[in-house]
Structure formats: structure tokens, C-alpha cells
């Protein structure tokens, strides 16, 4: 919801004589009812409404944040430059929140504590060839793109894997789920949205947005003559995502054992991936220099790489760039959706990379391990048969999920319920980046029209009832909007898939992506989200605010 005035100020009266904050909050509540309250969304801590005194202060903070963003490199090439060519000559701050989103401290701690178990789960999944082939046997009937990935994985397995070491960079995405039916009138729980491996957008911007928000809150404290009382129990968590993930890549490069070999980053050269180039190229080179290594990081789109790489098939299966540069590590963020494979040349290049002895981040087995069917009953137990505590820790973050490849009564019932009540479910394909997710009436229509074979490429997931935060979104002028925040927890792992030995397993930081509560697709690559950060509050404070907001609505 757009607004042309400041936010909550107890002594600020508008021209009609009504307190401006009361008028603004009332309009937001009306908008909330229209935009999603019927889906079970619940409004939470409204600290933003308490910390801005008037419109002049809001505009000052907006310009202050923009200026500071430029000073710390929180910028990205604009998507529509004046000359029509995407270039880093024209740079502006990306879509960012002016203030950090409130989030329950207990749920954040839960997400951090489960991350190393999540890393190991997907390492074990990616190392189980038979499981992957079985998991995708129905998917490939209705998804030709994933069928090509499965075909490559089978080819590499049958030929013999030439590089047992593998790198997993993971981002596990969560929301704070509101369950109104729980004892005591409702409670919050951490629920997983999805897991991404390899193309994990956000780590480059995540740290700088946290830095910007700290600066804005410091400026507010100066304006207030001290920290506002409503922020007394808040805490901004430390975020070193860029450095930690770069460390995992640097260590992987070192493990290859050739100091002259290059690190090849496959990445599209557009604005949404600019921050990934920042942390890969600059941070890895910086780490190498500190350790006495000269790491040559080269960035290419998959299409360009397909014309310049070659494989030594008669020797040790080394991968070369331009015939002379041996490749130690390939970090793959390009080639995750069909549009990034316009010709057979891209498929040939990806196959060549998978057959090589270069260490991959990730290899194709990790790409397949992101099947959303891992949440189905019995799957986690398969990979941790003797560790019920770890199984329970992981499963505590799952929401309801159903595979659609069967023709049994249970499958028919859940499909019929999703068609009747589409607001309670999400239909997901195996495509990453938020592009294979379907909602509401589009989902219901697809379920009615798909054949059994087509359904096998999808899963149904219970829709999460998120917390909706009142937040300033940086635009010109700034807007006050209802937003839903999704927290991404980063983790990294290096392991030997031939024997299961783990060499590195770490929690690496977090990113927050927020979107308007009335927007379904919120990924940065989809253009619907903005970069955010966290301000942690005790759950009791969040719950008190949530319950009072629910009563008001």
C-alpha cells in the first residue's frame, strides 16, 4: 500500500485532526484484509510504526540509506539503462527494505542449529545414485528438462566418477508459520519452503544489507537521543555469508592440488547475478592472496564456456579453458532452467564438465538431490537410520507434502481438496528459483487438466501461513507495505562421495528476502522480491504483538 506521509508518531496530527499513525494503521489493516488475511496470514511486531516521527524524518532516512548503500557498494547494474545495454556503468541500489524485518529469535536459532544436519542430509542424498534414479523415475515422464539431467547423471555414474570430491553450497529457505489452532490460542513454528544448492542468490548482498540496516538504526538512535524503547530487546545477528561461502570455495580450489589451475564460475551476466560475481570473484581472490595463493577466478556464461572448454578424455579427464588453462573448480550458477540451454552446445558443455576431474559446486548429483520429494515420509529416516534425534530436528521444519505420481485414494483425496481449497496448497515442480511454483486458481486448473504422468513431475505442499510485517520498502518515494519475509540459511559442505568422508560442514550466514503479501512469486530472479535483513525479538514479544493485531483485525 502506497503512502505519502510518515509512519507512526503519537503526537503527529494530520490536517483532519486525526492522529496520522491511527489513520495509517487503519488503512494498512483494511489493505491486509484484502491482500491475504483470508489465507491465515497474521500481522506481527509493528516496530516500524513506532520509530518514525514524521514525513520529513522518513525522507531523510530514505536518502541517508541510498547514500550509504552507494558508499558500501550495495549497488547493482540497472535493468533498463539509458542506452539499452546492460552494463556496470549505471548502478543503483537493488530493491531493499529501509528497515530490517522483525523475526522470532527462537526460530532463527532453530534454523541455524539445523543447518549442518541439512548439509549432511543432502550430501547423503547426492551420494545415493539408486535413490536419485528412483526418485526421478516418475518426474522424468512429465519433465523433459529434468530427464536430461538424470540422463547425464546416469552416464557419469556408468562411466565412472573421475572426481569424488564435491562442494555443496546450500540455502535452506524458511518462513515463520502461524498456527492459530495450537494450544494457547496460536503459536509460531519454523517451516521450510525449499532447499537450493549451487545457485544460492543473496550472499553478496546479505552482509551489506545487514550493514546498511545497522547504520539506519544507529541514525534513528541519534534522532531519538538513544535507542527507541521498542527496540530494547532486539538484536541484529552477525552475518558473514559472503566471507564464509567464499572460504568454502577457496578451500575446495586448494584441495584440487594445482596452484596454477583456475576457478571457473558459470554465471549469467545480468543484474540479478551481479552480487554472486562480487562474492565469488573478489572474496576468493582476497582469501587466496592472504594465504599466499594467486587464485585466478574467471566468470563466463554457460553459452560462452561451451565454445571454450575441452576435456582430456585420453588422459586424466582434466578440464581445460582455451586449451591451456586447467580448471580446478567449477562453481555453477548458470544452467538451472531450460532457457539457459538454448542449443545442444550447452548440454554438451555441461556433460563435459560433469565427466571431468574438476571439483564441482555443485555436481549434477547435488542438483538432483534438491528434489522436493525428500520431505515425504520415510525419506529422512532412510539417510539417518540410527539418528532419530537428527531426523526429528530436520522433520520439525517440514510442512505437509504429497507426491502426485500415485493413483491411490490418498492421492485423489489431497488433489480434490487442493482443487476445492486452492488457497491451502502450493503446487511445485522440480525447477529451481521460484519459477516452477503455482498458486490458487492456476494450480487448481493445472491439477484438473494434468495426466498422471504429468502429475509425477510435481508435488503438493501445504501452504505456510506467514507473518506479515509492516515495513518500509525503499523506492522514490519510500512505500509502507505489508510484506512477508523468507529467511534463507546458508551452509557449505565439502565431502568425498566415494566414501562419505566429510571434510568441511558449516553454517555460513543468512539472507532475508521479502515481498508484498499479495505477491505469490517473491524470488529476486522473478523480480518480485527485495533484499532484507533480520531484527530478532523474543518470541513472546512477537506473539503478544501478533495476538493483539489479530484481535484488531
Residue positions per predicted region:
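Preference for protein termini
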Residues: 1-553
Amino acid at each position: 500500500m502506497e503512502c505519502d506521509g510518515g509512519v507512526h508518531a503519537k503526537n503527529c496530527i494530520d490536517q483532519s485532526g486525526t492522529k496520522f499513525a491511527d489513520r495509517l494503521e487503519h488503512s494498512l489493516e483494511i489493505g491486509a484484509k484484502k491482500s491475504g488475511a483470508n489465507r491465515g496470514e497474521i500481522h506481527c511486531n509493528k516496530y516500524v510504526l513506532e520509530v518514525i516521527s514524521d514525513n520529513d524524518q522518513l525522507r531523510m532516512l530514505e536518502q541517508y540509506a541510498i547514500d550509504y548503500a552507494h558508499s558500501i557498494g550495495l549497488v547493482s547494474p540497472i535493468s533498463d539503462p539509458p542506452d539499452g545495454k546492460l552494463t556496470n556503468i549505471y548502478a543503483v541500489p537493488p530493491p531493499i527494505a529501509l528497515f530490517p524485518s522483525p523475526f522470532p529469535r527462537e526460530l532463527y536459532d532453530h534454523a541455524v542449529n539445523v543447518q549442518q544436519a541439512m548439509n549432511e542430509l543432502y550430501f547423503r542424498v547426492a551420494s545415493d545414485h539408486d535413490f536419485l534414479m528412483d526418485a526421478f523415475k516418475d518426474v522424468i515422464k512429465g519433465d523433459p528438462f529434468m530427464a536430461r539431467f538424470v540422463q547425464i547423471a546416469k552416464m557419469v555414474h556408468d562411466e565412472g566418477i573421475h572426481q569424488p570430491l564435491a562442494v555443496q553450497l546450500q540455502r535452506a529457505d524458511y518462513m515463520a508459520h502461524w498456527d492459530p489452532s495450537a494450544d494457547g490460542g496460536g503459536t509460531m513454528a519454523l517451516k521450510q519452503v525449499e532447499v537450493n544448492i549451487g545457485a544460492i542468490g543473496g550472499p553478496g548482498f546479505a552482509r551489506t544489507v545487514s550493514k546498511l540496516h545497522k547504520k539506519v538504526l544507529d541514525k534513528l538512535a541519534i534522532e531519538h537521543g538513544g535507542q527507541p524503547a521498542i527496540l530494547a530487546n532486539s538484536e541484529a545477528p552477525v552475518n558473514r555469508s559472503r566471507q564464509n561461502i567464499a572460504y568454502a570455495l577457496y578451500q575446495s580450489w586448494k584441495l584440487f592440488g594445482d596452484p596454477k589451475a583456475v576457478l571457473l564460475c558459470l554465471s549469467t551476466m545480468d543484474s540479478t547475478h551481479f552480487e554472486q560475481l562480487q562474492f565469488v570473484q573478489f572474496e576468493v581472490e582476497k582469501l587466496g592472496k592472504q594465504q599466499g595463493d594467486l587464485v585466478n577466478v574467471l566468470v563466463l556464461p554457460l553459452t560462452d564456456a561451451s565454445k571454450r572448454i575441452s576435456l582430456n578424455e585420453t588422459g586424466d579427464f582434466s578440464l581445460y579453458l582455451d586449451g591451456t588453462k586447467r580448471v580446478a573448480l567449477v562453481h555453477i550458477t548458470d544452467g538451472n532452467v531450460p532457457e539457459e540451454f538454448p542449443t545442444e552446445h550447452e548440454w554438451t558443455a555441461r556433460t563435459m564438465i560433469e565427466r571431468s576431474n574438476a571439483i564441482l559446486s555443485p555436481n549434477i548429483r547435488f542438483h538432483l538431490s534438491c528434489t522436493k520429494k525428500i520431505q515425504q515420509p520415510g525419506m529422512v529416516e532412510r539417510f539417518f537410520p540410527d539418528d532419530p534425534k537428527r531426523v526429528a530436528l530436520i522433520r520439525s521444519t517440514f510442512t505437509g507434502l504429497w507426491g502426485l505420481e500415485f493413483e491411490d485414494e490418498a492421492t485423489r483425496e489431497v488433489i480434490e481438496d487442493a482443487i476445492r481449497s486452492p488457497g491451502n496448497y502450493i503446487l511445485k515442480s522440480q525447477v529451481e528459483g521460484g519459477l516452477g511454483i503455482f498458486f490458487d486458481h492456476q494450480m487448481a486448473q493445472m491439477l484438473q487438466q494434468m495426466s498422471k504422468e504429468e502429475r509425477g513431475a510435481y508435488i503438493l505442499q501445504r501452504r505456510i501461513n506467514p507473518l506479515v510485517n509492516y515495513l518500509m520498502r525503499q523506492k522514490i518515494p519510500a512505500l509502507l507495505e505489508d510484506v512477508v519475509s523468507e529467511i534463507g540459511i546458508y551452509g557449505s559442505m565439502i565431502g568425498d562421495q566415494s566414501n562419505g568422508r566429510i571434510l568441511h560442514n558449516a553454517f555460513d550466514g543468512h539472507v532475508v528476502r521479502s515481498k508484498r503479501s499479495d505477491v505469490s512469486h517473491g524470488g529476486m530472479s522473478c523480480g518480485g522480491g527485495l533484499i532484507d535483513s533480520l531484527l530478532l525479538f523474543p518470541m513472546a514479544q512477537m506473539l503478544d504483538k501478533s495476538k493483539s493485531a489479530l484481535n484488531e483485525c
